[in-house]
Amino acid sequence: MAGKTVTRADLAESVFRKVGLSRTESAELVETIIDEICNAITRGEVVKLSSFATFQIREKNERIGRNPKTGEEVPISPRRVMTFKASNVLKQRILKAHTARKAKQKGQKAGV
């Protein structure tokens, strides 16, 4: 299910085509939005983009892990991790696209 990777340049090009800003302004807009999201997350704020997702930092306590090769117990230090939780709207869009893609593939196989 490997697909195309969307880059900052792709986002800027999309803004350029849809909004009508110059390519430079579009790239600056994309950078500014990404910077704002990163800064908010770094400050420990929750970033909620309605109908898309929520990003937040979560504290993970120290725990005991295991070396898979030796089976030896290894302490894993406490740390902060970023979590991404897709909204229900995004989940439904993904499911709908997946279902449509599967139906299309099934139709192509039947026509062969």
UniProtKB/Swiss-Prot annotation:
Keywords: DNA recombination, DNA-binding, Transcription, Transcription regulation, Translation regulation. The keyword Transcription regulation applies. One of its GO terms (molecular function) is DNA binding. One of its GO terms (cellular component) is cytosol. It comes from the Bacteria. GO terms for biological process: DNA recombination; positive regulation of metabolic process; regulation of DNA-templated transcription; regulation of translation. The keyword Transcription applies. Signal peptide: none annotated. PANTHER family: DNA-BINDING PROTEIN HU, INTEGRATION HOST FACTOR SUBUNIT ALPHA. Belongs to the bacterial histone-like protein family. This protein is one of the two subunits of integration host factor, a specific DNA-binding protein that functions in genetic recombination as well as in transcriptional and translational control. Heterodimer of an alpha and a beta chain. This is Integration host factor subunit alpha. The lineage of its organism: Bacteria, Pseudomonadati, Pseudomonadota, Alphaproteobacteria, Hyphomicrobiales. The gene is ihfA.
